């Protein structure tokens, strides 16, 4: 099958699209979406299935309308994977579904399937996973070696607006007791310097390492003795749960029904339900290397069937059984397809269409016609076609 992913965010590009590719399907990744290039991608690639997922720059209300209009003109199923559920179901997922009108919705929250079905949208559960080419075990690296690590953004503003969310409880159980006791945690992620209100004291600046690229996280998971993994909900698992275990990390997480439903605490990972338990288990496992390493091995085994290839296969099984699609490939980026036929330009911050036209010695009108623009408004990251490439025939003549 040919699957078109309307996505540009690295966190999602390395997951489900690669899962489909490894399952033998041909995948095109759109990159930044525009009103014009959606139609061109569909016309040139001729996908059997179109997938959108998450909450990224490709999900502005304007782009939702573009996607809906382009996909409804063709008889190709549009699927949306709601990865922001349940925290943003009301303020994001449901408005998106009403605007974009997908043919099927997958959600990471099982209980929401009935909600979407009641709206007249076919739905099913699809959990997070990990991709083995990104999250795999390596030998510990000195740069990331430490006793305890957290790889996550802090989200202080979200916690301020939503103090009732389970993430707040997870934070108070797993992180706050250690910080208050002066036990070092090394943090990778944004805004941990703003968390004193929720932790009870300032985190020392030399414990905070800032943003870590998504593709580098496995190095921390493989190098730290203990990885603390916060949970956002009691009824479902975070994506990092799978990624940490897939990378061979030793995971300390919240004691929730979802964790116990999937894993066996003390065998695959360790859990805590109180600050006291957190302190006790951290002290114990930092001093019992052999037990810790045994749990690491078991944790990796526990997610062997939770790769994104498994999720891709599951998605297709559901779509076939629900009548959305009928009964081996490579990953293709739309920009590479364009390069075969056109001279292209990636818009950088501050550039205007007039500046680009002057740079390539073409008229503004030519650029607007070639790219089907109705105005000269462009944005950083956009791919602009400049002109068709010239080719030589067998008589060495340009055509």
From Swiss-Prot:
Location within or outside the cell: Spore wall
Residue ranges occupied by any LysM domain in the UniProt entry: 343-386
PROSITE patterns linked: LYSM (PS51782)
Entry-linked Gene3D superfamilies: Glycogen Phosphorylase B (3.40.50.2000), LysM domain (3.10.350.10)
Gene Ontology molecular function: lytic endotransglycosylase activity
GO CC terms of this entry: spore wall
Residue spans crossing the bilayer: none
Tree of life domain: Bacteria
Keywords, alphabetical: Sporulation
Gene Ontology process terms (BP): sporulation resulting in formation of a cellular spore
SUPFAM superfamilies the UniProt entry points to: LysM domain, UDP-Glycosyltransferase/glycogen phosphorylase
Key word NADP present: no
The record's note on its domains: LysM domains are thought to be involved in peptidoglycan binding.
Note: Expression of ykvP is regulated by SigK and dependent on GerE.
Record's protein name: Spore protein YkvP
Source organism of the structure: Bacillus subtilis (strain 168)
Taxonomic classification: Bacteria, Bacillati, Bacillota, Bacilli, Bacillales
UniProt gene name: ykvP
